[in-house]
Amino acid sequence: MAAIRHLPNTIWALLMAFSAPAVFAAPVVSLNVEPFSTPLEQLNQSGSCRRCDLRGADLHGAHLIGADLRDADLRGANLEGANLEGADLSDARLAEAHLQGATLTNAELSGTDLRRADLREAVVINAYAPDVLTEGMEFAGSNLTGSHLIYGGK
C-alpha cells in the first residue's frame, strides 16, 4: 500500500474503503409524520378520531366500520346511511345527529348522548349502550334486536 500513496485522495479513499473490513450500519429511517389538517382527514386516514370536533360534519354514507370515535363531538352531524358497525362511540355527543338508516351493529354506545338524534330505520343490532341519553330520540322503524339500551336520564 505504501507504493500507491501518491494517488489522488479520492482514489486512495476508494482503495482504503475496499480493503477495510466491512461495517454494516442500521439504516436511518426518517419519519416525517405530518399532523392531520382536519379531524375529517384524521378519521378518513386513520379510522380513529377520539375527542374530535366533528359538529355538523357531513358523513352521509361513510364507511366507518370499527372506527374509534370515543368522546367525539358529532352534534348535528349527518351520518345518514353511514356504516358504523363495531364502532366505538363511547361518551360521544350525537345530540341532534342524523343517523337515519345508519348501521350501528355491535357498536359501543355507552354514555353516548343521543338526545333528539334521528335513528329512524337504523340498524342497531347487538349494540351495547348503558347510560345513554335518549330524550327526544327518534327510532321508528329501527332494528334494535339484541341491543342493550339503558336509559341514563336527560
Question: Which sequence ranges carry the predicted segments?
Answer:
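Bacterial N-terminal signal peptides that target proteins for export
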Residues: 2-11
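Tandem repeat scaffolds
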Residues: 26-154
